[in-house]
């Protein structure tokens, strides 16, 4: 009712302001009171002008009654305008606000008031709509969080299982089975990156280990070939030694014979037949010495050829071991790459720990994954250190083998020089024996004219004695040279034995690893290719 009155009495602009409405009502009441007072005053004045006291009294009473009635009307207007349903509206709004505080957001907040009370209703309605929207957003966010938590738990479980699989494969690789490969069963980019890097690394290690095995086999085969050639050289040296000994013995016999001839040359005339016979014996001995010297020279030349072959084989072995050393260095680089992967895995574990800390109460899965990845990194680092130790051992053995082979090459070169010296000595011996043989032949031919050429024969015998002494000295020198050569060959044998032992040790070290090539070789029963076939 009051709203209808105010709508009728007040303009729209005033109705929208509670303060304006109050001012308008007070102005209207004041104006109405002044108007009624003026009317009452006019009636009282008119009655007084007539001089009728009763009329004045009646006019005064009427004015007072009118004022009382006007006061009631004014109070009613003020109550209807200012009070109206304000208290009821505020009480209703308070009740509805209390229901909203209890969680009832379906409360109707509608009013026909157009003043501040109506604005207050509208503000509460907007607040209710905002709270309802916020609650819906919070509900959706909670559902999204629950789904994200569920997905995170699934990812944690998947990563944990994947990490366990990776750990098993890496353990088998660390035990020497280089045929194992990672096969990621997850879409996680970090795990796929680890899979690709690890598989690429294992391919490189497997190829290098295969090459090292082939090189070790080639070194072992070359060592056997060198040993066989060295045995041939040893046998040839023994033949040369025997030949030189025979030459030395023959030269000694020849020297004694020549000295005996020199002592008996004073009685040349009486002993012409004896000289002829002795000359025949000396000629025979000289021919034998010449033949023996020629055979020794041929044997020495054969020894030189075989020593040159030994030297060539040794140089090939040195080249093979240097290539082996280069391959071992490449394994060292792969080992450094493993260490980098281990470092990256540690970083992944740190990231997982950080994500676990961010996830608050839901961090158990992340923590487990972080621990698993960290353990995986530590195992990878341990495998890397073991591979580094193996590489260091192989490098030390390879360097020792290269040094031994080079020393063997030096010994072989010295042996070749020794044999060449022996050949030169034998050639001098042969020349001396040939000259001795020529002299003896001349003595034999001049036996009929011995009396006339006694002095000449004496001179020739003296020359022959000097030549025989030189021959004996050369033969002794050749014998010493041959003994030195034999010692050099024995040293070569010792070096070859050391090389064979080191090659066997390297093969035994590599046999602890499994590769695809080794598995194929076991299945097909095919021989291992030598390093030169690569």
From Swiss-Prot:
Membrane topology: Multi-pass membrane protein
InterPro entries for the chain: Chemotax_Me-accpt_rcpt, HAMP_dom, Htr2, MCPsignal_dom
Domain named Methyl-accepting transducer: residues: 229-465
Positions with biased composition (Acidic residues): 516-525
Residues in the Cytoplasmic compartment per record: 1-22, 82-534
GO MF: identical protein binding; photoreceptor activity; transmembrane signaling receptor activity
Family label: Belongs to the methyl-accepting chemotaxis (MCP) protein family.
Name of this chain's protein: Sensory rhodopsin II transducer
């Amino acid at each position: 009712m009051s709203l209808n009155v105010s709508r009728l009495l007040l303009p729209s602009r005033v109705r929208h302001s509670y303060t304006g409405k109050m001012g308008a009502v007070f102005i209207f009441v004041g104006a109405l009171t002044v108007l009624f007072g003026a009317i009452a005053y006019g009636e009282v004045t008119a009655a007084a002008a007539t001089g009728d006291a009763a009329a004045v009294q009646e006019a005064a009473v009427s004015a007072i009654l009118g004022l009382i009635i006007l006061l009631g009307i004014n109070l009613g207007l003020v109550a209807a305008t200012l009070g109206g349903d304000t208290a009821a509206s505020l009480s209703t709004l308070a009740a509805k606000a209390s229901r909203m505080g209890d969680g009832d957001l379906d409360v109707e907040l509608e009013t026909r008031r157009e003043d501040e009370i109506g604005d207050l209703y509208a503000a509460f309605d907007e607040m209710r709509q905002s709270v309802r929207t916020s609650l819906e957003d919070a509900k959706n966010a909670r559902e999204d969080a629950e789904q994200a938590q569920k997905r995170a738990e699934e990812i944690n479980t998947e990563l944990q299982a994947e990490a366990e699989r990776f750990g098993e494969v890496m353990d088998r690789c660390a035990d020497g089975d280089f045929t194992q490969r990672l096969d990621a069963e997850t879409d996680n980019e970090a795990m796929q990156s680890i899979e690709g890097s690890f598989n690429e690394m294992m391919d490189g290690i497997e190829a290098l280990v295969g090459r090292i095995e082939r090189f070790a086999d080639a070194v072992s085969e070359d060592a056997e070939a060198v040993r066989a050639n060295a045995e041939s050289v040893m046998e040839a040296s023994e033949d040369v030694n025997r030949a030189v000994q025979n030459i030395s013995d023959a030269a000694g016999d020849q020297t004694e014979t020549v000295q005996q001839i020199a002592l008996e040359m004073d009685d040349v005339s009486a002993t012409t037949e004896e000289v002829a016979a002795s000359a025949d014996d000396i000629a025979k001995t000289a021919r034998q010495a010449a033949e023996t010297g020629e055979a020794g020279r041929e044997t020495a030349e054969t020894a030189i050829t075989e020593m040159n072959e030994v030297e060539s084989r040794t140089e090939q072995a040195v080249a093979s071991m240097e290539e082996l050393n280069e391959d071992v260095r490449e394994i060292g680089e792969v080992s450094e790459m493993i260490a980098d992967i281990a470092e990256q895995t540690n970083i992944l574990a740190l990231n997982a720990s950080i994500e676990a800390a961010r996830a608050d109460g839901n961090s158990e899965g992340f923590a487990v994954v972080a621990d698993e990845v960290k353990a995986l990194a530590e195992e990878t680092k341990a495998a890397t250190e073991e591979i580094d130790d193996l590489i260091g051992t192989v490098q030390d053995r390879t360097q020792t083998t290269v040094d031994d082979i080079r020393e063997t090459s030096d010994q072989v070169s010295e042996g070749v020089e020794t044999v060449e010296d022996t050949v030169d000595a034998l050639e001098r011996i042969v020349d001396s024996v040939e000259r001795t043989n020529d002299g003896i032949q001349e003595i034999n031919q001049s036996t009929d004219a011995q009396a006339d050429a006694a002095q000449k024969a004496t001179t020739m015998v003296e020359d022959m004695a000097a030549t025989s002494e030189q021959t004996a000295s050369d033969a002794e020198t050749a014998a010493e040279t041959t003994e030195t050569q034999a010692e050099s060959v024995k040293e070569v044998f010792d070096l070859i034995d050391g090389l064979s032992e080191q090659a066997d040790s390297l093969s035994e070290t590599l046999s602890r690893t499994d590769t695809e090539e080794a598995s194929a070789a076991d299945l097909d029963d095919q021989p291992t290719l030598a390093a030169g076939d690569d």
